[in-house]
Amino acid sequence: MVMSELRWHTASPEDNKNSLKRDLLKSTPTSAREAAVHIMQNRYISRLSRSPSPLQSNASDCDDNNSSVGTSSDRCRSPLSPALSLSHQQAKRQLMSLQPHPAHHHHNPHHLNHLNHHQYKQEEDYDDANGGALNLTSDNSRHSTQSPSNSVKSATASPVPVISVPSPVPPMISPVLAPSGCGSTTPNSMAAAAAAAAAVASTMGSGISPLLALPGMSSPQAQLAAAGLGMNNPLLTGSLSPQDFAQFHQLLQQRQVALTQQFNSYMELLRSGSLGLAQDDPALTAQVAAAQFLMQSQLQALSQASQQLQALQKQQQRQVDEPLQLNHKMTQQPRSSTPHSIRSPIAIRSPASSPQQLHHHHHHPLQITPPSSAASLKLSGMLTPSTPTSGTQMSQGTTTPQPKTVASAAAARAAGEPSPEETTDLEELEQFAKTFKQRRIKLGFTQGDVGLAMGKLYGNDFSQTTISRFEALNLSFKNMCKLKPLLQKWLDDADRTIQATGGVFDPAALQATVSTPEIIGRRRKKRTSIETTIRGALEKAFLANQKPTSEEITQLADRLSMEKEVVRVWFCNRRQKEKRINPSLDSPTGADDDESSYMMH
């Protein structure tokens, strides 16, 4: 030993290296291991001090097969890695390089087997001394030339006891969570935890590209995503099929389940003491904290990947739905415009209308026109006898006539039946309304008196509102044509009465021709009061049918012991109330504008 030390100090470096190898073979296993560790410490410390910065080194240096092992590993080393941070394969290659070939020195088979066993024992002792071969090399440098698919395969092939989770950074978890044989936390383990945290932070922004490496994707875009493209890549926008999205979601769920299972199994190993760590050991606390930190990091990465995938799926769905909705709107516009023009009642309206009247027709802007000659000429072109209009329907007697549709009007014209619209001119109707108002005022009758008198004389009850709308030309053309003959008859009877009395109006003379003479001069009918129980029965009937027929009204009046006219008026008022409560439920025909407005209590 003394001679070898002298030769070490006096000989050249290559001679010293060869002599050191010979001394290592002659020494015991323990001394050989210590010498190997000492040599590698000196070599790597010296080379680490001479090696350039990782930022200045080229990635191609890591893959240079002609360079030495130490130089290649030093160039690819992370700045946080200590001098003794060797992987298992690198340590084995270093230890094997120090051993001479057994065939050059031994020819006995028994002695050869013993030497091989001795060499294997040295490798195991070195692994134990270094705490499971901590590998703290940078994850980015180790995977600079490795495809994402290969990294996923290597992650799925990792054993369960050591947390090697299939995640965007699969090789990063094993070094930190590898069980060490030492009883206290060493600076190497703290540096390993720091390197792992830095690697997690550097890989958080990579998205879900490493997670999507599925070999059996059904589209080229999915293969690009599996090859590592991010979700913001324009090639993936709006091009993935629903099957691809389902496969992506399934893969993310599988990765999350596998990550949780492996984390739980590793925590059970730590708590059970199978790794040789006591419950009060500080190293156990450090291992648990590191495992929880990495578990949360991976779960966060999976959550971000799932959110990005859902956002992409929603964006693609919107891009598909927008053209369909646009086409649907374009096809629905011409269909909806034509029936609206047919159903809209075209009426003449003056500014003197009451607010209640304007409320019923606020959705027809073309109806509000001043009663002038110019407006009459304009409306005369629209309100021709052939114009299919539908407006307010008058209640003739006890029947409720239905509005005449375009088809029924055409059938009536084909059959030769003259309709009121065909026999009445618009200008003539306007002139009659003006004359009727002047004559009524001259005779001293109110609008309410005219309505009640017409009900008793001709069997048709009209409200004051109906007479007012007729004079203001606020009724539909169809209803005005129906009301004109009745008002004309009332004016003729009033003129005959005046002529019979010598030019002086005598209401008694008009009463002589009326079957019920007490009706003339009488005001509006007294308000009808309905009991609570009867009102509840009427409400139930209204909810079942808002527009009952004449026979149904008769049956309901008989069952409640009420007059049929009272029941009919109550339904009319109840429909008007429903329109005020729910304007959207207003019928487009406006068939209830002329209904009687008796007040109910």
Curated annotation (Swiss-Prot):
Tissues with expression: Initial expression in cellular blastoderm stage, then in ectodermal stripes during germband extension. Broad expression in the neuroectoderm followed by limitation to discrete subsets of CNS cells, and expression in specific PNS neurons and support cells.
Keyword DNA-binding: yes
Pfam families according to UniProt: Homeodomain (PF00046), Pou (PF00157)
GO molecular function annotation: DNA-binding transcription activator activity, RNA polymerase II-specific; DNA-binding transcription factor activity, RNA polymerase II-specific; RNA polymerase II cis-regulatory region sequence-specific DNA binding; transcription cis-regulatory region binding
Similarity-based family: Belongs to the POU transcription factor family. Class-2 subfamily.
Role played: DNA-binding regulatory protein implicated in early development. Involved in neuronal cell fate decision. Repressed directly or indirectly by the BX-C homeotic proteins.
Region (Disordered): 1-32, 49-94, 121-158, 351-425, 581-601
Signal peptide: none
Protein name: Protein nubbin
Record-linked PROSITE patterns: HOMEOBOX_1, HOMEOBOX_2, POU_1, POU_2, POU_3
Membrane-traversing stretches: none
Keyword Nucleus: yes
One Gene Ontology biological process: regulation of neural precursor cell proliferation
